[in-house]
Amino acid sequence: MPFRPQRLALLMLAAIPLIGQQYSHLSGLIRDPSDAAIVGAAITVANEETGFRRSAESGADGGYGIASLRPGTYKITVRKEGFRTIVRFGVKLETAQPARVDFTLPIGSMQETITVEGGPSLLNTQDAAVGTLVNRERIERMPLNGRGLLSLLELAPGTVVTPATRGEAGQFTANGQRPNTHYFTLDGVSVNSGVSGGGLPSQSTGGSLPGMTALGSLHGLVSLEALDEFRVQTSTTAPEFGRLPGAQVSLSSRSGSNEFHGAVFQYFRNEILDANDWFANRQGDSRAPLRMNDFGGALGGPVRRNRTFFFLSYEGMRLRHSFAWRSAVPSEQARRSALPWVQPMLNLFPRPNGGPLGEGLAEWTGRNQRPSRFDTGAARMDHALGGRITLFGRFSFAPSQSEFGNTQVNQLTMESGSVTAGMNARLSPWLVFDTRFNLANASSESLWWSTNPDAGTQCYFEPVTQQFFRVPGLCDFQFRFSFAGVGQAVWGRESDRGQKQWHLVPMAVISAGAHQIRAGADLRKLRPLRRDRTSALNLIAENFVDLLNGRNLWSAFARPLAGESILSEVSAFAQDSWRIHPRLTVTGGMRWEYAPPPRLSPLASSPDLLEAYRFDNQTEIWPVRYRNFAPRAGAALKPFVNRDFVVRGGFGLYYDSSLSIATDLVNGGPFILSRYTNPKNAPFSTLLSYGFMPGLVLPLARQWNVTAEQAFGGRDVLSLSYVGSAGQRLLRRELGAPVSTQSFQIALVTNHGASDYHGLQIQYRLRSPRGINGLFAYSWSHSIDNSSSDSALHWVSTAWRATQDRGSSDFDTRHSFSGALSYSVKPNTGSWWRRARGAWELDAIVRARSGFPITALSSEFALGVGFANAFRPNVAGGQPLWISDRAAPGGRKLNPLSFTAPTSETQGNLGRNSLYGFSMSQIDFALRRRIPLNDRAALHLRFEVFNALNRPNFADPVRSLASPLFGQTPSLLNLMLGTGSPGSGLTPVFQTGGPRSVQVVVRFQF
């Protein structure tokens, strides 16, 4: 019988159901006053909020272990005949973080009880992972723009928010990993089941895009009101974590307790107290209108005390906003002189309101006010069957819609829903089973139109289609016009997509003396759908003058694509955490990834599509491989008995099993199997297709780190880490030699990508008895690669070498700092001044980083296709690269005289990403007042300010030499980081780098 991984997975399911990644694990040692092990001590752990209990006994070495504990606050009771009983309250267990609590039992009667309070050690003495926990207290207190997760993710060292693209919207990088390599889980199951809204859905179809709303926010995963806490792990995670090599973000949702608790809130902002956009000020425009209402509530409590609990949450947002934008558009003279069939394309752009820029272009500065909205609701139930079995179920639903644009408008409509169920069973003192199942569904529809009323209706572009097809009445098209130096204009239905996920996660935990063994499996099926029924026409001009004259244009036509693929993923792992010595714990294990090629349904429009995939009569899109084994090892050592000092280190292999590349040929358009016609080479035309390099394998990352941690005074912790990684066989899309010809071009997905990252990271956790609580992180690092994106297309020639494109990563950030600080003034009695000063709280988030690297390009098009690396210019000697200009945004701009275009389609001597853009710094703060209403209820009033100092943070300069705005920044940073969709980042009003904005909050909480 042939080997089938699916059969192996089914056997594993029968044998080893699994423990969820969001659980915590408690262990420790029980000793007597002489430091000898106490055997047979009874340990009882009880959740202080729900009453849930688990028990264990200490072994021959005095050690104990209790697995599968939900994050929360616990009471631990330790009893042994001949010793006094110890009860420790307030032991906080955190998401995806093992905890250790040791006890020394005094000699005496067991009826005598000693009560102490305090949690586990502040130091991680259990594993080598580099990570950061964000708890409920910090979630509630921090000023979070848009009340989203993205601001909190930046608090982990090594993480940086990055510009999103239409193809990849990961929105942040972690320790040099690409932005589309992060894995999000909620309550132990994957929430990387989002769907993109753009024409390049590659990240979403492969299951590497988290569930987002139409605004690009992560509320599609979980609203902050329903989030208990989360942990971000960025290096050398244990074998139970995997699928993607980037950050592992483990989210835990809130549940009910024995006491009713809840909140009702309203977040409001408008432009009255806001600062004006820097570009609007320069233009003499007033502040842009802004209306934001974020409202909702939550309620949790018992259905039956100590047994059944519920938690409900709802959040809704209504937003109308606009942004100042500067762009080059066709001049009035150009519109009048253009050929009749060209004029409809020019009218997609708004009419100029600024001075001439030359070559038929003029300046336009303007703003578009557009509405956005989302609603997200969730319900969770928890039930305990005695002290051994717990059950839970969770349902969520999140519809959303957003409109955004500068010269054109994009309307995106999305829906997502999810159902999760889980069971946890302690079958014996040494064995715990856990199984979870998730079903998720998401859909999106994207439409484009122009803000210029002269653009008319869809059939307004009939003269364009007649020019190329000579058939009247062709109106049902999506049009995309790209002009070097200007950008692109889009009209029509861009995409109609869906995504379904089935996810089954079983695991087992065995506690055997000094060993804690975990083994399990992870089975996921994805079904990305494409329902695009509209043909697409793309026109590209290398310069604007050619467009006006209707010559030297590349044209591309794509037929409608409708179909689906079925992607199956199987993972398995086994690991052992071995307490070799009371001060040394070693964790080692293996993870196995199986990611076969997808099963594709026939496409009605392209029944021969599969034939285009194959090389040398391959029967699969790429070879099936069963040897994707990833060993990992780590150790934590406490070298000194009486010092709170720990040294940790680890190493591991991590596969990128995302299958985004598997559906590029089906979903990676919009121009799939398109025919590009270049009049310069007439009568020839170029057939553009997509394919995979023969022998394609999963990308691989090697990660390693060494960390030293020191605790101070039982409250503060300083961590110093060296973190490194090396990416091999990374995906890189290439077009050109040697497989392409003049009449047939193939864009190949290859394994030619490579990367390196080295970083020094410092984190300081502060908790002062005077009411000060802080978390600070600094990173000094360098990330290098020859491609920073799976979806970007690279030009290669016969003379191309991999080192030609090697340079700083697109997201390389040499220096980055983040800090979260809270200060609480305790209520006072006495004078009116003392009473007024009390109950005030101040919170702040600080962010600062150096600039992103940029590359000047002499041309972004070749063969009618946009490239990430085509073509870099030559650097002219004797000229400064940057010149000071007080009139330019940021006071400087790139010097056009420093760059000259190559004489042919070749790379110049300017290195990739050898220039750096503007740095960023911003302070957000919140002033809060708590007004007690009774012992359990209070009214919270908050005043939040984002970019409190109103420091202008500028976007990177325009990089195309063909643009009249070359070298100058077109907007503030928030517009570069995102434009507001899951395919192009979080909406700018919630991004870092915008003008100062003020928010007022009223919240009732009990």
Report residues per predicted region.
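Short loop/turn motifs that connect adjacent beta-strands in outer-membrane beta-barrel proteins
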Residues: 222-225, 239-242, 256-261, 304-307, ...
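Signature of Gram-negative outer-membrane beta-barrel scaffolds
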Residues: 477-484, 488-493, 500-503, 516-640, ...
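Hydrophobic, lipid-facing positions within transmembrane beta-strands of outer-membrane proteins
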Residues: 170, 226, 245-247, 293-297, ...
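Residue-level signature of outer-membrane beta-barrel architecture
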Residues: 234, 253, 301-303, 383, ...
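Short, solvent-exposed micro-motifs at the edges of structured domains
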Residues: 152, 223-224, 291, 583, ...
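Acidic, glycine-rich flexible loop segments
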Residues: 112, 121-162, 166-171, 176-431, ...
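Periplasm-facing N-terminal accessory domains of Gram-negative outer-membrane beta-barrel systems
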Residues: 3, 7, 13-135, 204-208, ...
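Transmembrane beta-barrel strands of outer-membrane/channel proteins
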Residues: 118, 264-270, 312-316, 393-397, ...
